[in-house]
């Protein structure tokens, strides 16, 4: 296993050079991999495993996702089954349902988790907060995780392009003594690039913090705050949007993703440079207490409980659609529609920052 230096901290990382696909195939040659759920992660992981030569079946209830599985080449009665039959046939049960669905389907899955099988997740939620989810696996099975750092669509797209999406991995329970090898083999099989060592609880807490923080929740809050202040001070919608969202997403993010923030600061105008360096600390000091509060809420299980409770309500979908409609119809994101239609994007920024 490779050890990489991340800013002075050494971490264990598994690469495809150390653990080639041929080795993964050998380890899993006698296994039947049952992918349960064909929604977000299911298609990418199942199709990549199949294309990499593993014995894969899919378990999915009738409906739109079942029809998608058929369209993707899974054959009813041969490689596509109901959830119960797939769990019975599978020696490795990959539970790729949504967190809410895992809770409702768990009583169906559990009876088929007989001694020596492996239960696989791509998110630590159900196990980390199993006092709330009720997902308590039998003691005589392996419980493992490979969590791709991106969507199932990205995993599949990158696989077809000959690239790998990085993933984290963890072993929660090793009943057979072979859980680690199975985990890494599956990580390679689904098309991972690097595999980073973690635990179920670390994956779950960092994932929920990221979603509520800089990946989605905080970024919308920050963008909206700046947009509102610009609008309140007489700037037009297009001007406020361009200086808040458009330059960030279309010009700057690809650059600092590739080169780092220090490169960005070194390669912008002196006015932008001085302002960014001066204001990053006040923003950090204002935001960090909010992130600390968020992390405490995640770690305590409060955020998990909120998710469980909201997803369990009969009118959840109706209320969610109303929230998304309000977001979509807000001035900032309606402005986005017009801006995107009217501007011609080019691959490199025309401004110096």
Region spans (language model):
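NAD(P)+-binding Rossmann beta1-loop-alpha1 motif at the extreme N-terminus of oxidoreductases
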Residues: 2-77
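Rossmann-fold dinucleotide-binding core
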Residues: 120-212
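Interdomain hinge/lid region at the active-site interface
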Residues: 224, 228, 232-233, 258-319
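Single conserved hydrophobic/aromatic residue that forms the stacking wall/gate
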Residues: 344-353
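Rossmann-like NAD(P)-binding element
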Residues: 61, 74-128, 137-151
């Amino acid at each position: 296993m490779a050890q990489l230096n991340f800013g002075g901290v050494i971490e264990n990382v598994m690469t495809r050079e150390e653990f080639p696909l041929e080795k993964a195939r050998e380890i899993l040659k006698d296994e039947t991999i049952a992918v349960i759920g064909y929604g977000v992660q299911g298609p990418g992981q199942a199709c990549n495993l199949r294309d990499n030569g593993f014995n894969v079946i899919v378990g999915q209830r009738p409906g739109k996702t079942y029809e998608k599985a058929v369209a993707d080449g899974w054959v009813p009665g041969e490689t596509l089954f109901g959830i119960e039959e797939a769990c019975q046939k599978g020696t490795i049960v990959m539970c790729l349902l949504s967190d809410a669905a895992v809770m409702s389907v768990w009583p169906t899955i559990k009876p088929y988790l007989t001694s020596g099988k492996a239960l696989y997740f791509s998110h630590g939620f159900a196990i980390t907060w199993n006092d709330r989810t009720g997902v308590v696996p039998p003691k005589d099975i392996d419980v493992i995780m490979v969590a791709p750092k991106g969507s199932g669509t990205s995993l599949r797209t990158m696989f077809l392009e000959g690239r790998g999406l990085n993933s984290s991995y963890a072993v929660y329970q090793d009943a057979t003594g072979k859980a680690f090898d199975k985990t890494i083999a599956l990580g390679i099989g689904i098309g991972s690039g690097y595999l980073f060592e973690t635990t179920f609880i670390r994956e779950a807490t960092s994932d929920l913090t990221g979603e509520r923080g800089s990946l989605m929740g905080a970024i919308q809050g920050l963008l909206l705050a700046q947009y509102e202040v610009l609008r309140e001070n007489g700037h037009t919608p297009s001007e406020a949007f361009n200086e808040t969202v458009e330059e960030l997403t279309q010009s700057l993010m690809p650059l600092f993703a590739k080169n780092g923030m220090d490169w960005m600061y070194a390669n912008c105008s002196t006015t932008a440079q001085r302002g960014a360096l001066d204001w990053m600390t006040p923003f950090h000091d204002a935001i960090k207490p909010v992130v600390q509060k968020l992390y405490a809420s995640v770690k305590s299980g409060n955020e998990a409980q909120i998710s469980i409770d909201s997803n369990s309500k009969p009118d959840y979908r109706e209320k969610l659609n109303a929230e998304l409609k309000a977001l979509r119809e807000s001035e900032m994101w309606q402005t986005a529609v017009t801006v995107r239609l009217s501007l011609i994007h080019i691959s490199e920024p025309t401004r110096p920052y």
